[in-house]
């Protein structure tokens, strides 16, 4: 006799979240936002990291939301210890200030999966407006691949012609090209993936254009951090600016970034624009413009991230003659955008993150690609 199963009666395993923040208001709001979701629950709140440490031991949560500035031990110190001793998915809750942005970049380096920018004023209304973003980032964090941080983080210091961040010395490509263009798309986990690639590219690399999903106010610090580590120059893209070899241009948060052409030069177009695939900046927007303008002189790179932003346009790039690299699942924090790019037939090579920069250099240095026009 057939037995009918009512799926509504099946209790799904909920994402267990611990909220750590020194503000009672923020703790209460975040707990309320989380508990409204059918697939997650706030199992505990703590007003400082030392209490959180005991709570993590007792409750074994799936995800931690962590404030940056707290008493007794700040969030960055706690995060560093946590990722060395008991790595777990962490979503940072950071203040939208220049200092907050710089510290957030450090948190992502230490292993935080993502961050939410809470407003300096109107916290209650601001967090309520961000509720969809908060729960989405918690869900993504719960599925992310978390890696144990090294006992002593390697200091990455730029040295022309020498090693950067512990890597082998950066090889020269041998010819500065104004025709070629490298374009990179990333989302969750992308800040560190982008750093891994850019710190391994030489000063004579072609121009590089990058879209990393990031809100306004944070890309300036991201670009400045990369610029201090790389042999190439790294900056936020500026509307109308010529795209130069040996330079990387990052889409400003909250703007759409395209590549255009003016005579023999590639030019950055930065504008407000509409959300595309729910994102601004959107990888789809950048890659579609590269397919149209750069064609077979483009090299595409799709890195870790949730969703499908950029997958269709990366296939358009391939159809226009580009050569595309996609990060493999094992090295991704979230294997969403790379998976979609592969499913769309956009990948020429699927590689571990650490292999992408050497493969790019080899491709750019090869005789067949050096004179590809």
From Swiss-Prot:
Record-linked SUPFAM superfamilies: CheY-like (SSF52172), Methylesterase CheB, C-terminal domain (SSF52738)
Residues forming the catalytic site: 187, 213, 309
Coiled coil location: none
Main location: cytoplasm
Gene3D superfamilies: 3.40.50.2300, Methylesterase CheB, C-terminal domain (3.40.50.180)
Top EC class, one word: hydrolase
GO BP annotation list: chemotaxis
Protein function: Involved in chemotaxis. Part of a chemotaxis signal transduction system that modulates chemotaxis in response to various stimuli. Catalyzes the demethylation of specific methylglutamate residues introduced into the chemoreceptors (methyl-accepting chemotaxis proteins or MCP) by CheR. Also mediates the irreversible deamidation of specific glutamine residues to glutamic acid.
Free-text domain note: Contains a C-terminal catalytic domain, and an N-terminal region which modulates catalytic activity.
Name of the protein described by the UniProt record: Protein-glutamate methylesterase/protein-glutamine glutaminase 1
């Amino acid at each position: 006799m057939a037995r009918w199963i009512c799926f509504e009666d099946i209790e799904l395993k909920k994402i267990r979240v611990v909220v750590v923040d020194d503000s009672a208001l923020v703790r209460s709001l975040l707990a309320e936002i989380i508990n409204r979701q059918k697939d997650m629950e706030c199992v505990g709140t703590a007003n400082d990291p030392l209490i959180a440490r005991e709570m993590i031991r007792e409750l074994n949560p799936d995800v931690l939301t962590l404030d940056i500035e707290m008493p007794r031990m700040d969030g960055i110190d706690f995060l560093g210890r946590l990722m060395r001793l008991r790595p777990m998915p962490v979503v940072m809750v950071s203040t939208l200030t220049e200092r907050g942005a710089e510290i957030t970049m450090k948190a992502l380096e230490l292993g935080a999966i993502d961050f939410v920018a809470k407003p300096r004023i109107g916290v209650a209304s601001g967090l309520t407006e961000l509720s969809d973003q908060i729960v989405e980032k918690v869900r993504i964090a719960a599925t992310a691949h978390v890696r144990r941080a090294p006992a002593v983080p390697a200091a990455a210091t730029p040295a022309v012609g020498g090693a950067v961040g512990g890597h082998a010395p950066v090889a020269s490509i041998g010819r500065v090209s104004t025709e070629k263009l490298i374009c990179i798309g990333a989302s969750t986990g992308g800040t560190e993936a982008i750093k891994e690639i850019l710190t391994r590219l030489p000063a004579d690399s072609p121009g590089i254009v990058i879209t990393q999903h990031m809100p306004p106010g944070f890309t300036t610090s991201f670009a400045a951090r990369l610029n201090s580590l790389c042999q190439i120059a790294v900056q936020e893209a500026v509307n109308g600016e010529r795209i130069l070899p040996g330079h990387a241009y990052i889409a400003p948060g909250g703007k759409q970034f395209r590549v255009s052409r003016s005579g023999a030069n590639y030019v950055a177009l930065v504008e407000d624009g509409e959300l595309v695939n729910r994102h601004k900046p959107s990888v789809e927007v950048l890659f579609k413009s590269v397919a149209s303008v750069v064609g077979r002189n483009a090299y595409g790179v799709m890195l870790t991230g949730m969703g499908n932003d950029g997958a269709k346009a990366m296939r358009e790039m391939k159809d226009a003659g580009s050569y595309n690299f996609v990060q493999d699942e094992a090295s991704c924090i979230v294997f969403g955008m790379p998976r979609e790019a592969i499913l769309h037939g956009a990948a020429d090579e699927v590689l571990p993150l650490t292999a992408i920069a050497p493969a790019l250099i080899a491709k750019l240095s090869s005789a067949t690609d050096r004179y590809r026009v």
